[in-house]
Amino acid sequence: MIAASTPDAGCVALPGLSGNLFVVTGAAGGQGAQEALLLAANGADVIAADLREDAPDLRAAADDLPGSVTYRRLDVTSEEQWRDLADSLAGRAVKGLVNNAGVTQRTRIGDVVREDWDRVLAINVTGPMLGIQALLPLMGPGSSIVNIGSAAGLTGHYTAAYTTSKWALRGLTHSCVTELGPRGIRANIVHPGYIRTEMTADAPAPFLDANVTIAPLHRGGEPEEVANVVVFLLSDAAAYVTGAEIGVDGGQFRSGVATFLSEAVRSAQHPAASALPH
């Protein structure tokens, strides 16, 4: 079950969220769901999009929140579906877009299948670009784009397609900063490390153990911890923050453990095809 992440009593709600509209992809579960729920907990209206037909747990968790969560099935690689989503908003202003949908592929470079390579790049890079293109006409000054990268996008992991896609997403983010800044639109990217979700449970045990053991904080992250950073970046509290790259990884990247983690994956002899969230 998905639990709503509601601000503690007495906390001041983040400015610029209540009453505004946000779109979050990959929102049927994991950190995407928590991002949608935290926005709704701050009074925002959220379009939670995902490839699944429905997300009943997400909708149930949002029932008692001050904002709203509307679920919509979306293939982020479909230009037509993005266009239909934009048209369905009837010209309502979009305050923020979170490009959270993503998959990985744990495969040696020499074993990468072209079809799998194309799929990872289509979802992780082309999807965010199509979303930005479709919603940009509805975004004005004060709007915000948050792309979800990965610690793999800061170094070289044993996941060639995934790592390449996250480096590319950084480039797309930087282009948005330069091009959209004069229009008052901000763009930032968040780099999660190992985040505990139902989808990361099938990752190789040596990889998970290495994440917990070697990270300076000695634990995995929770989806809510990523959501906290994402929602801050969407809010007016971050009105002068654009071009930021924020790691939510327990210090893994800065402690230089990327090579060890890559070796842990390599040694695990895990099946090649595996889709994981960030």
Question: Each PLM stretch: what is its role?
Answer:
Residues 108-109, 116-118, 211:
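Substrate-binding pocket helix/loop in short-chain dehydrogenase/reductase
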Residues 132-133, 174:
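A short, exposed helix-loop element centered on a Lys and neighboring polar residues
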Residues 12-47:
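Canonical Rossmann dinucleotide-binding motif of NAD(H)/NADP(H)-dependent dehydrogenases/reductases
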Residues 2-13, 242-278:
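Short C-terminal tail/terminal secondary-structure segment
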Residues 146-168, 173-182:
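Catalytic loop of short-chain dehydrogenase/reductase
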Residues 129, 138, 219-248, 253:
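C-terminal substrate-recognition "lid" of short-chain dehydrogenase/reductases
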Residues 137, 178-182, 239:
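Alpha-helical segment proximal to the catalytic Tyr-Lys
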